[in-house]
Amino acid sequence: MNRTNICKNIVQSIKDYITDQVKLEPHRVEKHFVRRRKLSLLQVIIYLFFSSKASMFQNLSQIREELGTLSFPDVSKQALSKARQFINPSLFKELYYLSVDLFYSQISSRKLWQGYHLFAVDGSRIELPNSKSTFDFFGEMSSYPDPNRRYTMGLASIIYDVLDDYILHASIHKFLSSERAAALEHLKVLEDMGLYNNSIIIFDRGYYSEDMFRYCVEHGHLCVMRLKEGINLSKKCNGDMISVLQGTSKEGTSDVPIRVLEIPLDDGTKEYLATNLFDPAVTKDMFQELYFYRWPVELKYKELKSRFAMEEFSGATAVSIQQEFYINMLLSNLASLIKNEADEEIQISAKSTNKFRYQANRAFIIGRIKSIVPKILCGLFELSIIEQLYTDAVRCRSQLLPGRSFPRKKLKSKGRPHFRNKKASF
């Protein structure tokens, strides 16, 4: 099944889910959305899909104008803010998981690198609004030189299907949570879905530990982990070597072979990689290309923070933050389906005489997905609008500029740029 049809199936499944009272029952707070009130559970759910980064006044006005079939009532922003607190974030997590399950069960063929599927794991700090709720849930921190200044942040972590441009699993935690613990959660999901066979998982610096590497070996995960330059494995490595992680009878562990590679970079520095991939078809020179496939997960965070403005939360509670986090993961996956399908058509129709290669404009697709999904959910649009979006995406293309490379600049830390009292006007 092609990606456009999978996108249609996901949206239809979401619509079926949120209109089924039996399925919604576990996701509402007890004794709420029971009586007939102005705001129904369905109306609040669709509002959360519909709302933009503008103020709530703008969103409430626009949803009544644009989604007439929803019969959205004239309520205050305080009433809506209160109502959303009675929807468990597990609902939106479930809808996001639905998008993952349908994609991997319905996709006809997946992309490969040297016969392997590629996944990348990475975490990123998320700026959160300051409130009692976020302080209690995510933790409260102070800063130097003013210890009285209190703030909070979160840690987002994802495992990303690099070649198929899909977020397989995502989670949000306290800022000081362990990235390795979050990564282990991702690996267990990969095991539960049966997707770890014939797959390579790429980790950045900071993820390697002997326990982490042993877990990958013992559970059948092929992995590539970048090492810090200061550890013994890196210091002893010269080219391509096989070492052994010694087991101990006290801990009940056995010896584990580990391949360590020294990779020269274009700027003259070296990076060190640890792997349990001993396939002779994957040579040392290919590992530099393989590790570079981790870069798209960085671009995915850029998409989430820039295109989706993920850190511009409309609510200031832990419940609101988790709701919006999983909605963004879901919409990002829907946009990637259209983007990749359109890219394939663009490549097929490209002429050999073209000066540049082109790709579908992701920003355009994200904007349209954000606009049409709530309209499909409330019955204003038919699913066929997704096919029209695909057609438009093939036409709305951007140049691919090859060979671009920029030196990494060490930026000075900036203050918090996201403020709830400074919302966009539209």
Short names for language-model regions:
Residues 100-108:
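A short, well-structured juxtamembrane/interface segment
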Residues 1-60, 74, 79, 84-87, ...:
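Single, function-defining residue in the core of a domain
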Residues 137-143:
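Short Pro/Gly-enriched beta-strand edge/turn motifs at strand-loop
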Residues 62-66:
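Short alpha-helical "recognition helix" segments of helix-turn-helix
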